[in-house]
Amino acid sequence: MKNVYFLSDAHLGSRAIEHGRTQERRLVNFLDSIKHKDSAVYLLGDMFDFWYEFRLVVPKGYTRFLGKLSELTDMGVEVHFFTGNHDIWCGDYLSKECGVIIHREALTTEIYGKEFYLAHGDGLGDPDKKFKLLRWMFHSTTLQTLFSAIHPRWSVELGLTWAKHSREKRVDGKEPDYMGENKEHLVL
């Protein structure tokens, strides 16, 4: 029987997380622990805190994680990557170089006779008009083309700073409940 794993919101590379390299190593160690099993992995968005692929450039870093994804797919492990609001700008690098299956939309699939609706969750049913406008802007091919014209030295810096600011913002002036050691929501 195939083992199926669901992971999301690692936010690798985040400047708001104190020990980012340690976090990446822990994630890679977990993925390493499942590599010999008949398994499938669903990465449900925001695995990176900011990911933007330029035509010939991808963000610096994430070497251990990208290498482990490549190793898993080379061994026949099915790895599904759903884009989230921090990594919506995936081109074809992850699929061509690492062998992952990219999903830009929600997926309904059957696993062990049960139907699953898989998505990052960003914007699902969110009525906030400002958020919808921002989401539209991030998905606009015209704005992506303009952003691509900015040298990666500045655009990646802008993206990482924006992501850090977004993470540090408080919801209604309070910290949300059920936060883990890296200030991530815990869902049990």
Residues of each region from the PLM?
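Context-gated lysine
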Residues: 2, 35-37, 60, 68, ...
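Core catalytic region of metal-dependent phosphoesterases/phosphodiesterases
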Residues: 2-3, 7, 12-111
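Short hydrophobic-aromatic micro-motifs
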Residues: 6, 115-119, 126
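Charge-rich, low-complexity amphipathic helices
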Residues: 29, 49, 56, 70, ...
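Acidic, His- and aromatic-enriched active-site or binding-groove loops in soluble protein domains
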Residues: 110-111, 116, 142
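Active-site-proximal loop/helix segment associated with metal-binding centers of metalloenzymes
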Residues: 121-183
